[in-house]
Amino acid sequence: MEGKVLQILGPVVDVEFEGDIPAINEALYVEFEAEGEKKKVVLEVAAQIGDHIVRTIAMDLTDGLTRGEKVVATGAPIKVPVGEAVLGRIFNVTGDVIDGGEEVPADTPRWSIHRDAPPFEEQSTKMEVFETGIKVVDLLCPYMKGGKTGLFGGAGVGKTVIIMELIHNVAYKHSGYSVFAGVGERTREGNDLYHEMKESGVLDKVALCYGQMNEPPGCRNRVAMTGLTMAEYFRDEEGRDVLMFIDNIFRFAQAGAEMSALLGRIPSAVGYQPTLATEMGKLQERITSTKKGSITSIQAVYVPADDLTDPAPASVFAHLDSTTVLNRKIAEKGIYPAVDPLDSTSRILDPQIVGEEHYRVARGVQEVLQKYKDLQDIIAILGMDELSEEDKLTVARARKIEKFLSQPFFVAKVFTGADGRYVELDKTIAGFKEILEGKVDDLPENAFYMVGDLDEAKEKAEKMKAQS
């Protein structure tokens, strides 16, 4: 089926057909010459506006496209390659390789990016902890297998490093695959991530899909679905537990708002699209556990002007099972990962799911840290000497806990020179339990800094003692 370009309004292109017209979400393509170069732009049908005309959204820049150009309907939605062939490669929204390497093999299966969420009877209702090997996460804001986690933090507090460590740990411990969707973020960051993954040796376990800030809104919105489709294949066809990273989910909503305005829809609150909740729900409902496998997603959430009531982040919160909040003040103390132990939450930190002991230890740790936070004003004004003996003990334990929440990362070895640590959940719980019970009150607090489990902290204390 062929048509011709009728009108071009930036990324919105109207196409006229004779006879039948393509369905909503069908992919069309137009080949044209611009400045002596051959270009091929994929268009996706967004609306049928009557008189055999469809309104489409372009997945690439339309610079140089002119009226009357021939448009070809593919008869299907955008289809992207899936399976083992996508690992270690970078793709764009339409599934083309953009890392400068060779194309994926011709026999690679391709799936449509528009898919339904798994039916209820196939979904798993089990609530299980997804062990990450990162102490602060596993103890205080455990991730749920097949759940969704929001990663909140400003620029430069270590979101990317945590994402890379999680990719490393899921490959190392669960021999699992990860998919990373770069949605509307900086090209430089995408480039850095690729090279850092190459250096730290996790690249062959991850597929990357990029739709960067400089791309049209159609590309930035749909690239999240491209990545998700690749993850769904590993879950549904290979029965794997997959990690899905979206950086940044806010840009998905932002691109949707741009598309909506360009299509002439009436905006809702703060200028967002009227279908914001529907679009977010469609994407998030596909991220789930089935009886075959699971997709556990970690989504970086940018909060515009730190306003948590903004419709875009608010539409994300409705879907999250846990939140990992990164805090600059903690990073300034040199404690990495800079996860805020009092602000981060998880729906599954419940004695019926994680067990009584884990719950008690986690709440105990938060209680001690909260007390320490409350005492900080007194310490700043009057000094430690004015505190009661009980408060002094609380402060000493809190400082040990704070230091013990740090740990060396495998992917940061290039910067720190220290080997990474993967700490099993039971060792994490046992370690913090001993600190709370006062069994290690005699050890210096520096022995707890940047170590794995408590045994390592004890060894470090012995070494410090021998050196002094």
Swiss-Prot record:
Main location: membrane
HAMAP family xref list: ATP_synth_beta_bact (MF_01347)
Amino-acid positions noted as binding ATP in the UniProt annotation, renumbered to this chain: 153-160
Topology of the protein relative to the lipid bilayer: Peripheral membrane protein
Descriptive protein name: ATP synthase subunit beta
Superkingdom, taxonomy of origin: Bacteria
CDD domains (alphabetical): ATP-synt_F1_beta_C, ATP-synt_F1_beta_N, F1-ATPase_beta_CD
Family membership noted in the UniProt record: Belongs to the ATPase alpha/beta chains family.
Organism, as annotated: Nautilia profundicola (strain ATCC BAA-1463 / DSM 18972 / AmH)
A GO molecular-function annotation: ATP binding
Compartment(s) where it occurs, according to its Swiss-Prot or TrEMBL record: Cell inner membrane
Subunit structure: F-type ATPases have 2 components, CF(1) - the catalytic core - and CF(0) - the membrane proton channel. CF(1) has five subunits: alpha(3), beta(3), gamma(1), delta(1), epsilon(1). CF(0) has three main subunits: a(1), b(2) and c(9-12). The alpha and beta chains form an alternating ring which encloses part of the gamma chain. CF(1) is attached to CF(0) by a central stalk formed by the gamma and epsilon chains, while a peripheral stalk is formed by the delta and b chains.
UniProt keyword annotations, A-Z: ATP synthesis, ATP-binding, Cell inner membrane, Cell membrane, CF(1), Hydrogen ion transport, Ion transport, Membrane, Nucleotide-binding, Translocase, Transport
GO cellular component: plasma membrane; proton-transporting ATP synthase complex
EC annotation from Swiss-Prot or TrEMBL: 7.1.2.2
InterPro entries on file: AAA+_ATPase (IPR003593), ATP-synt_VA_C (IPR055190), ATP_synth_F1_bsu (IPR005722), ATPase_a/bsu_AS (IPR020003), ATPase_alpha/beta_chains (IPR050053), ATPase_F1/V1/A1_a/bsu_N (IPR004100), ATPase_F1/V1/A1_a/bsu_N_sf (IPR036121), ATPase_F1/V1/A1_a/bsu_nucl-bd (IPR000194)
Annotated catalysed reactions: ATP + H2O + 4 H(+)(in) = ADP + phosphate + 5 H(+)(out)
SMART domains: AAA
